[in-house]
Structures are given as structure tokens and as C-alpha cells.
């Protein structure tokens, strides 16, 4: 579970649907990324990070 990602999304009061829409991925893909089931590609990591305003390399520090 990527709690840090969940916390960033909740802090900004955004839904998984909203983040997925803005990042141009499916909600199910975003849910799998947030839960830690899947790792995002670099382009997807950059899109999610842009929407939530954080450094995309956080995805790859785990």
C-alpha cells in the first residue's frame, strides 16, 4: 500500500476517478498503483505527480 500516495490524494480532497481522468489512465489502474499492486511507468508516474503536485521519483524510492 502506498499510504503516502493515498494521503496526498486525500489531502487534496480528490477522488481516484479524478486523478485517473487527469492522468489519462483508468480508475482501476490508478487504484492498483495506489494499493501497490502495480508500479507506474515513468510517463504515468510523471502525470500522477503533476496532478498531485509532488516529485514523480517518489514512486521509485520504495
Regions found by a protein language model. Give the residues of each.
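Short basic helix-loop element that most often maps to the first helix and adjoining turn
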Residues: 3-22
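Helix-turn-helix DNA-binding elements, focusing on the entry/boundary residues of the two helices
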Residues: 5, 16, 27, 42-45
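Key DNA-contacting residues within the recognition helix of helix-turn-helix
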Residues: 6, 31-32, 60
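Residues in the helix-turn-helix
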Residues: 18, 29, 58
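DNA major-groove recognition helix of helix-turn-helix/homeodomain DNA-binding modules
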Residues: 24, 43-58
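Recognition helix of helix-turn-helix/homeodomain-like DNA-binding domains
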Residues: 25-40
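Extended rod-forming repeat segments used as scaffolds/tethers
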Residues: 37, 41-44, 62
Amino acid at each position: 500500500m502506498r499510504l503516502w500516495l493515498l494521503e496526498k490524494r486525500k489531502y487534496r480532497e480528490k477522488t481516484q476517478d479524478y486523478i485517473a481522468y487527469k492522468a489519462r489512465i483508468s480508475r482501476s489502474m490508478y487504484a492498483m498503483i495506489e494499493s501497490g499492486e502495480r508500479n507506474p511507468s515513468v510517463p504515468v508516474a510523471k502525470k500522477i505527480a503533476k496532478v498531485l503536485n509532488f516529485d514523480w521519483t517518489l514512486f521509485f524510492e520504495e
